[in-house]
């Protein structure tokens, strides 16, 4: 079922017809030449967040903040069209993966093992989020200072992408400054 292709979409090896989703994979490679592997899957917990229209952007797990960062939600796109790669493109240089609205998840990295582990991490993050928010109903999120320290560690460990989760104190995301720490979701003051 695997088809080996070049970055122009030409089949090098394999007898199956490539999926229309190959456009999404190829776009990730073109957007960020450092990416050498892309994993697309439909893991149940992460896909549930994608169907609900919710990104994975809360600072609840130290491992998630350090390892994959926030996982944004790419807007809905019609399968098989250029809308799909266009919806993913804005996240490729700044994040390590994304959810695909009403579809599934996508992870990328400099090698296949790391891309696969990031997909596993996305699903774990989604599953823990479901348990704590839905079943337990109580979440103790990390503070802005704790998130900053984890991001500094992540950067020292060589991971320069991942975004910044929402601030616990005010839930601020996007370009507006947090009323607690003064930073936006990109970590800019």
Spans of features found by a protein language model:
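Glycine-rich flexible loops
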Residues: 1-189
């Amino acid at each position: 079922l695997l088809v080996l292709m070049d970055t122009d979409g030409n089949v090098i090896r394999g007898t199956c017809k490539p999926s229309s989703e190959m456009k999404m994979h190829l776009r990730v490679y073109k957007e960020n030449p450092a990416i050498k592997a892309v994993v697309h899957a439909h893991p149940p917990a992460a896909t549930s967040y994608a169907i609900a229209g919710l990104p994975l952007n809360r600072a609840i797990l130290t491992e998630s903040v350090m390892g994959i960062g926030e996982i944004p939600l790419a807007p809905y796109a019609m399968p098989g069209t250029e809308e799909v790669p266009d919806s993913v493109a804005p996240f490729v240089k700044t994040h390590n993966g994304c959810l695909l609205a009403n579809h599934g998840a996508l992870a990328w990295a400099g090698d296949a093992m790391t891309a696969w582990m990031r997909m596993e991490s996305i699903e774990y993050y989604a599953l823990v989020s479901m348990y704590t928010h839905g079943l337990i109903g109580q979440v103790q999120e990390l503070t802005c200072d704790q998130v900053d320290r984890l991001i500094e560690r992540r950067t020292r460990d060589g991971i320069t992408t991942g975004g910044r989760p929402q601030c616990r104190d005010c839930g601020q995301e996007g370009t507006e400054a947090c009323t607690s720490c003064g930073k936006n979701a990109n970590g800019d003051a």
